[in-house]
Amino acid sequence: MTGASRRSARGRIKSSSLSPGSDEGSAYPPSIRRGKGKELVSIGAFKTNLKILVGLIILGIIVIYFVINRLVRHGLLFDESQKPRVITPFPAPKVMDLSMFQGEHKESLYWGTYRPHVYFGVRARTPLSLVAGLMWLGVKDEMYVMRHFCENSDDLSTFGWREHNGRDYGRQELVENDMVIETSFVKSKGDGLGYGGDWAVRIDVKNKGLNDDVKRSAHLFFYLADEGGNVLNLGQDGLDFQGSSLLVSGSREDVGDWQIHLKSQNQLETHYSGFKTPHIYNLSDLVQQNLALQARKFGRLQLSDTSEDSSNIYIFQISGRLPFTIDIPFISGIKGESSNVEKRLTSLTGLPLSDLLKKKHQEFDAKFNECFKLSEKHDSETLGVGRTAIANMLGGIGYFYGQSKIYVPKSTQPGSRDNFLLYWPAELYTAVPSRPFFPRGFLWDEGFHQLLIWRWDIRITLDIVGHWLDLLNIDGWIPREQILGAEALSKVPEEFVVQYPSNGNPPTLFLVIRDLIDAIRMEKFVASEKDEVLSFLERASVRLDAWFQWFNTSQKGKEIGSYFWHGRDNTTTQELNPKTLSSGLDDYPRASHPSEDERHVDLRCWMYLAADCMHSITELLGKEDKLSKENYNSTVKLLSNFNLLNQMHYDSDYGAYFDFGNHTEKVKLIWKEVIQENGQLSRQLVRKTFGKPKLKLVPHLGYVSFFPFMSRIIPPDSPILEKQLDLISNRSILWSDYGLVSLAKTSSMYMKRNTEHDAPYWRGPIWMNMNYMILSSLYHYSIVDGPYREKSKAIYTELRSNLIRNVVRNYYETGYIWEQYDQVKGTGKGTRLFTGWSALTLLIMSEDYPIF
């Protein structure tokens, strides 16, 4: 229900009116109304009150029953001995309770641009935060439209962070039609400030072209909302930019008394509206309804300049002719005159703010050059894309709080209509794949994200990985997609919210942890960083062990050393090839008929990586548990056994590695008339099998086939390595001028739709994460001794050049880094601003690869 309808409902709660000329006491004789006959009145009142009391008791019992029933269904009213295992936290000290994540570190990261789903937003790393954000009126098809949440459908020419250091500074550009909005965020710390310090936002709005003769106007909406429901106090009804600049003030336990100001040297018109609501995910609806009401009443496109009692949200409309600039400083920890409010305001507005932003810009450039050392290798355009990649990766980091929904069969919850339990309330600090489309945490993406982030800021990486590991349940399982909080839930269809505890996801966090271990061995860290990584591993090792054991037991296959991704649907008639969502490769073709006989070569290699990583941790930490160390060592030996790998997955005719399972190539989607539940006749695409499946290698060459190559299990002198190099470089199979395609052009599933509505996803398009991993192994084989060293180097050099050139070209043609790239033309596809693993382009530029 929208805010306007909530207010209307509240307005309808009035005392019952009486009919004209009626008197409330007219049912009684005058003598009784004057106080005579008190006994009659008392008895009548007693009977009435008794009925009401009984009714209230019955109603209360009913309410309590339903509340308790719901709490039990959602796992909120179990004692620890009765709580279902799936929603029971892992019984070990939390990683995030380490001292390294407290004190100055925690405070330094308290405030940030941790709302990746909106075009610009600020919040604190606390469940019920003070939240700030920006909206504006855009124009589409000659109509005003509200811009707030990042949406692909908004079709902005470009948007994203141009600079961001992940801690206290960021500069973003948003371009819509002929208008450019630049948002800058910077933090200030010092003695006497509130927890987390002060911060400021600068918003520059200008014409895209140099022609200032076209004086168009812009309407911005800057808002403050307190998720905890704390009352906000309006500074003044009308803003005088030359005088008082106070927008709104308030008080919170975390930061004390605070104020938000707005200052500008331009002629601007301002209006406001205040709301009282527990929800902030529908703020744009509140604004649009308020504007629409004002337009109908007065013909003006402006907020109402009114506020509800005890408002916890204030929205300020700032309108003016382009160009204009506004500065919005946040001052906290105010304690009387000693707080130097005016001095702090001066330091975060006007020229002092310009100087601070310039300093942060210079620091960003210096750190970028120090971390990636690209200046002598690439032209300015390529360097620009590299800066955009790291800036958007860091600027896309978000903070979320809520409870995941975990699937449980209804049969385990008698009388329940729900098929889920609620995970425990948890917070998550994480990078996200894409602000417009995937603005939340994804487990298998995060390992790739951290390969880039740790090279910029190791402490941010440890903080993020620690948050993920603290989501581990008692069985060693982590939900693969984190949809936490009302704002996140509002962006995801209900059918995709529930997480399945039998399903895994590639354990890519081992990828970055292994990288950190190798960095220690290669002495890439200063002493303090090394100590923190070791402390982190000491605390995290028990959780990593439990995570590994969950995979090693729940995803194991029938044969020793075999594994398969659980969760494939063996009953579906709607899919050409049942998806394997848990693998992260969704529609990549596997065995046509899912069964427990399957062996998935990619999961086998992930398990090799995980076991090798755990073995390295036990060695690095000098663990005394020899049994655990030997178990990991034996698992590493088993999974790196080249002969066993070949027996299970190698096809000597193709010279390639494949999955194994119950498979036939004779399947296709055909149109069939189907009677719906409502009796209507419709046509649907359904799968038809024309041949009996049998157990065999699944002949679909693609990314999955190269996991043994990516894992570097293949000896550098093996002829099988040459086979892999030939397959990679064959233009008729995987090679393109833009990168390696995800599925061989010779595959029967190449670019085939999986359902009527599912376009090919991992069946041809070029993906940067897999190209990065293959490229890293090409680099490896090009520097180790072996007969295929030069061949590896030649392929590596050309593939690297193709990948960089295509990403850079697309960025300057479209304004974005993309989720995937077309297998024929190289054009960007999928969601835009996909600066999750597509940002690995920067590591390709710097030739910085993990030791898989």
From Swiss-Prot:
Domain of life: Eukaryota
The protein's name: Mannosyl-oligosaccharide glucosidase GCS1
Function: Cleaves the distal alpha 1,2-linked glucose residue from the Glc(3)Man(9)GlcNAc(2) oligosaccharide precursor. Required for the accumulation of seed storage proteins, the formation of protein bodies, cell differentiation, cellulose biosynthesis and organization (in cell walls), cell shape determination and organization (e.g. epidermal cells), and embryo development. Involved in root development.
Cytoplasmic topological intervals: 1-51
Pathway recorded for this protein: Glycan metabolism; N-glycan degradation
BP GO terms, sorted: epidermal cell differentiation; oligosaccharide metabolic process; protein N-linked glycosylation; root epidermal cell differentiation
InterPro entries in the record: 6-hairpin_glycosidase_sf (IPR008928), 6hp_glycosidase-like_sf (IPR012341), Glyco_hydro_63_C (IPR031335), Glyco_hydro_63N (IPR031631), Glyco_hydro_63N_sf (IPR038518), Glycoside_hydrolase_63 (IPR004888)
Regions of compositional bias (Low complexity) in chain numbering: 15-26
Region annotated Disordered, chain positions: 1-31, 574-593
EC number: 3.2.1.106
Active site: D586 (proton donor), E819 (proton acceptor)
Expression sites by tissue: Constitutively expressed in roots, stems, leaves, flowers and siliques.
Localization in the cell: Endoplasmic reticulum membrane
